């Protein structure tokens, strides 16, 4: 599995991040936006799985966590937000015994746009390492 600057289940605790949002309107609508898209329930199931299975909920599943090297390019990311995001990315990289985190330098959140070759290479490397 290749995760591209992915959100983590901790982001369900959106109230922890409400001071990060640039406007009051975003703060009030953001949770409803995700609920309307059906994203929140899927994140809740991931959280439950992680809490149930302990340190490595995905066992030996090979996982590559691609982390943007510069979220500040988004314009609204503060140093505190960047610190939290990097912490969440590190936590994602610990969900499997066979996971690795790759810090994609000179890339903002949209790695798939700015450095798509990193994603392709990561997928290819995972496939190459599989037996048979």
What would you call each of these model-derived segments?
Residues 4-40:
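Flexible "cap/lid" loop of the alpha/beta hydrolase fold
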Residues 7-9, 69-72, 107-110:
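Short, solvent-exposed loop/turn segments at secondary-structure junctions
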Residues 12-17, 75-79, 114:
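Short aromatic-enriched loop/helix-cap "lid" or pocket-rim segments at secondary-structure transitions
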Residues 35-55, 84-91:
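Active-site nucleophile elbow and catalytic-triad environment of alpha/beta-hydrolase enzymes
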Residues 59, 65-67:
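Short beta-strand/loop motif that positions the catalytic acidic residue
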Residues 73-104:
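Conserved loop-alpha-helix segment in the C-terminal half of the alpha/beta-hydrolase fold
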Residues 97-132:
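Catalytic active-site module of serine/aspartate enzymes centered on a nucleophile-bearing elbow/loop
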């Amino acid at each position: 599995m290749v995760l591209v600057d992915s959100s983590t289940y901790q982001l369900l605790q959106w109230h922890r991040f409400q001071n990060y949002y640039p406007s009051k309107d975003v703060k009030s609508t953001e949770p409803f936006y995700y609920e309307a898209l059906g994203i929140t329930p899927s994140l809740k199931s991931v959280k439950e799985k992680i809490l149930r299975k302990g340190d490595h909920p995905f066992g030996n599943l090979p996982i590559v966590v691609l982390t943007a090297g510069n979220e500040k390019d988004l314009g609204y990311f503060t140093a505190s937000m960047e610190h939290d995001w990097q912490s969440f990315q590190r936590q994602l990289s610990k969900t499997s015994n066979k996971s690795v985190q790759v810090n994609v330098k000179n890339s903002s959140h949209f790695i798939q746009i700015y450095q798509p070759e990193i994603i392709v290479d990561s997928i290819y490397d995972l496939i190459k390492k599989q037996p048979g």
